[in-house]
């Protein structure tokens, strides 16, 4: 190992150490229902035999992730039992919130982020120092990950680490290993399958399309690898005749099109249009039955139909996502370049976020993290990432609704914006050329008028939602701030989708 590589690793560890210190400080922060969800999964996998994992209904927070994540929870439960046996008790552990369970689960997320650290390391180890350091800062210090994983509570950093590892191997031309890791990721969390068509087309064209004999051998090889991964995950449940129950838990379509807090996607406009038309038609004398205001509360069977516009089914959203991804698939087939994989993956997840079924706002991390890798490739990519990462982070604000958390989320976004600005300004400044012409050094990193105006609009939205609404309306129209945030952020995400599509087509 040369001196440069040692220095790079030390700097990466410094980034991770700073992030870890912040995460430790966030341990006492408030927790979402996801905290109890994962505690209950620890109890299920530790207290029950495998054959009962996907049948247990002791709590409403039933196990609905793929088997590899269940195995992961089972592994964690071994240590949880040593820390406090009540953590993994199905009955007495319900809604258990002692310090032991809080610290154990928080620290388990922090430790699992080592997977993210290794993914970033593999992706950036061959880049020039400035680009590498910038990606490390954007990913490891991601405010979205801090909010979702280390306050709200989830394991997105761990899962995204698998995704980054997969992309890193594809970029190195090690397609078989990249495909293997992606298959493993799907068996941890099936929602990452949105980009599976991209992987399929790319691997078929780049890895298998090399002559009849060689191509067929490679196709059989990678097919066998994927089948082996899924057999390891689902084999025990197939053996016990429970695969249908597992699938029904993983795909609870009865939860409805949208989550309780509307994720900033295309369906926000569809819902608003439906409600607006319903009100208008009723005023015009038509008998229109207006359903309840919340399209879903997040539980199975808790969803509302549309009043005027056609009902949307899971099949409809699947078709729309596939149609939106299709230009990327065509590009991947015509030009299967490994350097474009991260861009295609990010675009596919953007499509899934915009047009998918029952999308959570947290899913924006699926495309903002890969886009951080893309951001260092060109000045235009940096400008785009600056906008979309701010919008994505701001759309997560409703997850933290406690008054004491307000300074935290504002500070995280402000610091992230400053880090991005300084990093991109340094990345896209030609010091040598400018020193020859003038003593004044100016960066090429400037965002356009639309981007400036839109970001200023975010400040206005926040002032209205956080201060003006409660001051003037009090408890009236409680849904208005969330609807305003979701609608305004949708504009930014739609802009990002169009920008990415244009970039892929050109």
Curated annotation (Swiss-Prot):
Tell me what topology the record assigns in the membrane. Answer: Multi-pass membrane protein
According to the UniProt record, one GO cellular component term is: endoplasmic reticulum membrane
Q: Which UniProt keywords apply?
A: Endoplasmic reticulum, Glycosyltransferase, Membrane, Transferase, Transmembrane, Transmembrane helix
Please state where this protein is localized. Answer: Endoplasmic reticulum membrane
Main location as per UniProt: endoplasmic reticulum
GO biological process: one example:
dolichol-linked oligosaccharide biosynthetic process
InterPro entries in UniProt: Glyco_trans_ALG6/ALG8
* Enzyme Commission numbers on file: 2.4.1.265
Give the stretches traversing the membrane: 10-30, 101-121, 133-153, 176-196, 219-239, 261-281, 305-325, 339-359, 384-401, 406-426, 454-474, 479-499
Q: Kindly state which reaction or reactions the protein catalyses.
A: an alpha-D-Glc-(1->3)-alpha-D-Man-(1->2)-alpha-D-Man-(1->2)-alpha-D-Man-(1->3)-[alpha-D-Man-(1->2)-alpha-D-Man-(1->3)-[alpha-D-Man-(1->2)-alpha-D-Man-(1->6)]-alpha-D-Man-(1->6)]-beta-D-Man-(1->4)-beta-D-GlcNAc-(1->4)-alpha-D-GlcNAc-diphospho-di-trans,poly-cis-dolichol + a di-trans,poly-cis-dolichyl beta-D-glucosyl phosphate = an alpha-D-Glc-(1->3)-alpha-D-Glc-(1->3)-alpha-D-Man-(1->2)-alpha-D-Man-(1->2)-alpha-D-Man-(1->3)-[alpha-D-Man-(1->2)-alpha-D-Man-(1->3)-[alpha-D-Man-(1->2)-alpha-D-Man-(1->6)]-alpha-D-Man-(1->6)]-beta-D-Man-(1->4)-beta-D-GlcNAc-(1->4)-alpha-D-GlcNAc-diphospho-di-trans,poly-cis-dolichol + a di-trans,poly-cis-dolichyl phosphate + H(+)
Broad class of enzyme this protein falls into: transferase
- Domain of life according to the entry: Eukaryota
Q: Which PANTHER family match?
A: DOLICHYL GLYCOSYLTRANSFERASE, DOLICHYL PYROPHOSPHATE GLC1MAN9GLCNAC2 ALPHA-1,3-GLUCOSYLTRANSFERASE-RELATED
What's the name of the protein?
Answer: Dolichyl pyrophosphate Glc1Man9GlcNAc2 alpha-1,3-glucosyltransferase
Protein species of origin: Arabidopsis thaliana
For this protein's source organism, the top of the classification is:
Eukaryota, Viridiplantae, Streptophyta, Embryophyta, Tracheophyta
């Amino acid at each position: 190992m040369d001196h440069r590589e040692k220095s790079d690793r030390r700097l990466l560890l410094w980034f991770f150490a700073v992030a870890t210190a912040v995460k430790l400080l966030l341990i006492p922060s408030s927790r979402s229902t996801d905290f109890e969800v994962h505690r209950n999964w620890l109890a299920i996998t530790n207290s029950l035999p495998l054959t009962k994992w996907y049948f247990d209904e002791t709590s409403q927070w039933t196990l609905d992730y793929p088997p590899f994540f269940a195995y992961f929870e089972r592994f964690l439960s071994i240590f949880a039992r040593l820390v406090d046996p009540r953590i993994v008790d199905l009955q007495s552990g319900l809604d258990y919130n002692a310090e032991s369970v809080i610290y154990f689960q928080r620290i388990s997320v922090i430790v699992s982020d080592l997977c993210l650290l290794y993914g970033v390391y593999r992706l950036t180890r061959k880049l020039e120092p400035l680009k590498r350091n910038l990606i490390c800062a954007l990913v490891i210090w991601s405010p979205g990950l801090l909010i979702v994983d280390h306050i709200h509570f989830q394991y997105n950093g761990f899962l995204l680490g698998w995704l980054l590892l997969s992309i890193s191997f594809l970029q190195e031309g090690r397609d078989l290993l990249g495909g293997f890791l992606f298959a493993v990721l799907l068996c941890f969390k099936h929602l990452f399958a949105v980009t599976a068509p991209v992987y399929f087309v790319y691997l078929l064209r780049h890895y298998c399309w090399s002559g009849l004999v060689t191509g067929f051998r490679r196709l059989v090889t990678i097919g066998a690898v994927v089948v082996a991964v899924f057999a390891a995950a689902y084999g025990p449940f197939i053996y016990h005749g429970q695969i249908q129950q597992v699938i029904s838990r993983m795909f609870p379509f009865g939860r409805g099109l949208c989550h309780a807090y509307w994720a900033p996607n295309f369906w926000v406009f569809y819902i608003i249009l439906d409600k607006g038309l319903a009100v208008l038609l009723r005023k015009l004398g038509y008998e229109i039955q207006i359903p309840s205001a919340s399209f879903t509360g997040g539980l199975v069977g808790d969803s509302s139909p549309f009043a005027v516009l056609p009902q949307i089914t899971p099949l409809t959203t699947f078709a729309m996502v596939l149609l939106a991804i299709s230009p990327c698939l065509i590009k991947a087939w015509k030009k299967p370049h490994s350097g474009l994989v991260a861009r295609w993956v990010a675009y596919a997840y953007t499509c899934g976020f915009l047009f998918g079924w029952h999308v959570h706002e947290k899913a924006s991390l699926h495309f903002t993290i890969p886009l951080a890798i893309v951001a260092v490739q060109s000045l235009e990519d940096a400008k785009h990432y600056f906008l979309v990462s701010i919008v994505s982070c701001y759309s997560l604000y409703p997850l933290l609704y406690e008054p004491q958390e307000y300074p935290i989320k504002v500070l995280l976004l402000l610091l992230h914006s400053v880090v991005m600005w300084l990093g991109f300004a340094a990345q896209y400044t030609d010091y040598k050329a400018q020193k020859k012409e003038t003593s004044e050094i100016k960066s090429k990193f400037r965002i356009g008028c639309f981007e400036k105006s839109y970001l200023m609009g975010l400040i206005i939205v926040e002032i209205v939602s956080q201060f003006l609404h409660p001051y003037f309306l009090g408890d009236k129209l409680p849904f208005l701030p969330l609807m305003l945030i979701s609608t305004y952020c949708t504009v930014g995400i739609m802009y990002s989708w169009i920008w990415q599509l244009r970039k892929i087509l050109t």
